[in-house]
Amino acid sequence: MSIIPASVPAPVLPRRRQLLFGTMFVSAAVAMFEFSLVASYLAERAGKRNVWLTENSIPLTQPNMQFAALILGSIFVQWAVWAIARNERGQAYLALGCTAVMAAAFLNQTTFLWQRVGMTMAQAEGPFFYAVTGANFAFIALALGFILLMAFRALVGQPAAALFWHVNVALYAVVWLAVYIMK
């Protein structure tokens, strides 16, 4: 009689990290794209130094506050990673919400800055300014969408409660329309 079982169970495979590796590759591509835009901006500015920003000025208050919002967003998103690793869902949701608020603040400040600067595409610096800042705006917006997607993925453990909640919200929308709006 042998003490070794007839069949040994297969070992548990390590968790794959395709999302992490994919995000790393996309981040590298985004960085290369953004660096090329900044390089084009700097090359054009060096070539047209005497006419660059002669008609417009860019205030520093909004870019400084945008940077502060992004730094705070980085702190908050790291807090969310810490909370998710320790199964602290409440803290994770709070941290992701704070990150989303900081991203929204950044996007709001960017649009305010664009309006305040009032640069046109006909000016020498206009296309380059909007290409660099617009690409950054788009990537921060995509990051915000990614954060929100990850926040909803954390609800996977409670689908029945979430479904029940959403159905009741939809039912209240019908009641709201029929009873309070249409009277």
Where are these regions (language model features)?
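...captures the hydrophobic TM-helix bundle architecture rather than a specific catalytic motif
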Residues: 1-183
